[in-house]
């Protein structure tokens, strides 16, 4: 029996029952989301320490901050691509971002229970990644200039940072939704997302720190204690992505699945339009 949707008889009971049911049967996807963002933050921390800490020989070997930022962008873009196309990423959908999950909730592809647990997992996993880095590297990671890879508004100020975050989130989600309508296009979503991440880090980071992700920014703020401008990173990415969703709906666009890369050999817990997606089995 497939996992019951929000309007099925199995979910006509209490809201609490639907949340318990989701947790019982979808916890592997939640664990994947937590692990995915945790790994992403660890890779980000290692890259930034190696390339930006003054004591690093690699940082000294690349004196240009623009070039160092480009190298970090390539590394993090590649990490995003690897996450999306990994077996685990193909199962959970590789959201790794509460703003992405919220957008697919708005589009009717994710249930409220799954959206809540995805977001909790993403915040928890991101924090676990940075706290682990803090435990291993100590002040090298948590103090300036690294500050646990905190996202901070650039010299133009917080309003510019807010606008930049809305813009990059809007562009990224517009690309995802444009590719989402067919399996043929969706297979390239990960490559395009990774390319955008690399470009954003290389060119947009001086404006806002390039967050795109509320969980990612909170994860950095926890061990560093740097919370300046956190309101930007909690609000701008969801606003940008939700605006992209509204435009997508207004244009009559189709949303096939909440996965960034649908793969029919992996089960799909979402409201999925692709034929052959393995359904979640649910016990009575």
Predicted regions and their residues:
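Membrane-interface helix-loop junctions and terminal tails of multi-pass membrane proteins
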Residues: 1-284
């Amino acid at each position: 029996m497939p996992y019951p949707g929000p309007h099925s008889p199995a979910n006509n009971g209490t809201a609490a029952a639907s949340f318990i049911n989701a947790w019982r049967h979808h916890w592997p996807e939640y664990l994947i989301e937590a692990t995915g963002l945790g790994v992403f933050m660890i890779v980000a921390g290692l890259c930034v320490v190696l390339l930006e800490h003054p004591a690093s020989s690699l940082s000294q070997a690349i004196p240009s901050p623009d070039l160092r930022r480009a190298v970090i962008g390539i590394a993090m873009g590649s990490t995003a691509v690897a996450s999306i196309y990994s077996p685990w990423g193909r199962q959970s959908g590789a959201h790794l971002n509460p703003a992405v999950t919220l957008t697919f909730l708005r589009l009717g592809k994710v249930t409220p229970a799954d959206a809540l647990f995805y977001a909790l997992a993403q915040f928890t996993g991101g924090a676990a990644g940075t706290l682990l880095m803090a435990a291993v590297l100590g002040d090298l990671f948590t103090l300036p200039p690294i500050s646990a890879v905190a996202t901070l508004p650039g010299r133009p100020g917080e309003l510019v940072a807010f606008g930049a975050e809305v813009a990059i989130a809007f562009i990224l989600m517009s690309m995802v939704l444009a590719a989402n309508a067919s399996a043929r296009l969706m297979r390239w979503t990960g490559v395009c997302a990774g390319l955008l991440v690399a470009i954003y880090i290389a060119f947009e980071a001086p404006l806002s720190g390039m967050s795109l992700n509320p969980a990612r920014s909170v994860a950095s703020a926890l061990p560093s204690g740097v919370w300046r401008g956190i309101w930007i990173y909690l609000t701008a990415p969801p606003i940008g992505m939700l605006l992209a969703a509204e435009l997508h709906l207004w244009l009559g666009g189709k949303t096939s699945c909440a996965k960034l890369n649908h793969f029919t050999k992996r089960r799909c817990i979402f409201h999925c339009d692709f034929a052959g997606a393995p359904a979640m089995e649910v016990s009575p």
